[in-house]
Amino acid sequence: MGEKLICNNKKAFHDFFIEERFEAGMVLKGTEVKSLRDGKANLNDSFALIRNGEIFLHNLHINPYAFGNRENHDPDRLRKLLMHKKEIEKLFGKIREKGYSVVPLRLYFKNGLAKVELGLAKGKKLYDKREDMKKKDQSREMAQALREKSKSH
């Protein structure tokens, strides 16, 4: 079956250095799964917190299912993530270090199950963001120059 991407968190790559990646399952309601299959989710400004040895995803917005009834879900509810205890303990140890946080990078279906890819992230300073933008601009200009050169030949 493979993977089917639902959404990416491009803002996370702009605002953070991603040091390590983890995969986690999600505890969802039926209407949430149907909404995700329609691609109706937003990862911007979402983050994960660990409480009592369990990990929860905050600010993940999943639009209400269009054909749902009164049993439809709350779009911004807290969602529990499913990970091995050792992985959660490893994340918790890293989070206690200054400057680390856990952010979702992408949401996808893997073999029919909804998964979220979490990144152990460290915040970027303003000058780091500027540096990344300069590199991106330079690579874009180089690619454009190469295209122009290949067109002229």
Swiss-Prot record:
GO cellular component: cytosol
GO biological process per UniProt: trans-translation
Major place of residence: cytoplasm
Localisation: Cytoplasm
Signal peptide from the UniProt entry: none
Keywords, comma-separated and alphabetical: Cytoplasm, RNA-binding
Keyword RNA-binding among UniProt keywords: yes
Region (Disordered): 129-153
Transmembrane regions listed in the UniProt entry: none
InterPro entries membership: SmpB (IPR023620), SsrA-bd_prot (IPR000037), SsrA-bd_prot_CS (IPR020081)
GO molecular function, one term: RNA binding
CDD domains in UniProt: SmpB (cd09294)
PROSITE patterns recorded: SSRP
Domain of life: Bacteria
The protein's role, per its UniProt record: Required for rescue of stalled ribosomes mediated by trans-translation. Binds to transfer-messenger RNA (tmRNA), required for stable association of tmRNA with ribosomes. tmRNA and SmpB together mimic tRNA shape, replacing the anticodon stem-loop with SmpB. tmRNA is encoded by the ssrA gene; the 2 termini fold to resemble tRNA(Ala) and it encodes a 'tag peptide', a short internal open reading frame. During trans-translation Ala-aminoacylated tmRNA acts like a tRNA, entering the A-site of stalled ribosomes, displacing the stalled mRNA.
Entry similarity comment: Belongs to the SmpB family.
HAMAP family the record matches: SmpB (MF_00023)
The protein's name in its UniProt record: SsrA-binding protein
Source organism of the structure: Geobacter sulfurreducens (strain ATCC 51573 / DSM 12127 / PCA)
Name of the coding gene: smpB
